[in-house]
UniProtKB/Swiss-Prot annotation:
Transition state stabilizer, annotated site positions: 18
Name recorded for this polypeptide: 3-dehydroquinate dehydratase
Pathway where this protein functions: Metabolic intermediate biosynthesis; chorismate biosynthesis; chorismate from D-erythrose 4-phosphate and phosphoenolpyruvate: step 3/7
Gene Ontology biological-process entries: amino acid biosynthetic process; aromatic amino acid family biosynthetic process; chorismate biosynthetic process; quinate catabolic process
EC class of the enzyme, as a word: lyase
Designated gene of the protein: yqhS
GO molecular function: 3-dehydroquinate dehydratase activity
């Protein structure tokens, strides 16, 4: 059974209260609950991890290679400057899809650059929580199709 890691970075735990005009009112728990139901329908497993600490995210990326079929990564603002996360992603053989709830390219200029995107399989931005599902569907398609 395909098993994917949903990895969320700094401030994603503040969803629902942080800039709801940008990120919406769904909490991270709401999103995880919805994704859990989505995974059940596809007969796949998802594991969720969120940290506000760069090193914890790097450790999770390194450890993922032994446990998962791919990673959906929302690095938050770390996407703009974390060469350490970029290096962690490029050091593993798992496919990684970068996801952002908001459209980075419609926000402040400094958000228009991701140092992670060039080493990820792809990037999904601006589609809200639906972006996670699209990323999972892509990763699943790379496993030889949808389960069952």
């Amino acid at each position: 059974m395909p098993h994917f890691l949903i990895l969320n970075g700094p401030n994603v735990n503040r969803l629902g209260s942080r800039e709801p005009e940008v990120f919406g009112r769904q909490t991270l728990t709401d999103i995880e609950t919805d994704l859990f139901q989505f995974a059940e329908a596809l007969h796949i497993q998802l594991t969720f991890f969120q940290s506000n600490h760069e090193g914890d995210l790097i450790d999770a990326i390194h450890e993922a290679e032994e446990q998962y079929s791919g990673i959906v990564l929302n690095p938050g603002a770390l996407s703009h400057y974390s060469y350490a996360i970029r290096d962690a992603v490029s050091s593993i053989s798992l496919p990684v899809v970068e996801v952002h709830l908001s459209n980075l390219y419609a926000r402040e200029e400094f958000r228009h650059q991701s140092v992670i995107a060039p080493v990820a399989k792809g990037q999904i931005v601006g589609l809200g929580a639906e972006g996670y599902k699209l990323a999972v569907r892509y990763l699943l398609s790379q496993q030889g199709g949808e389960s069952r």
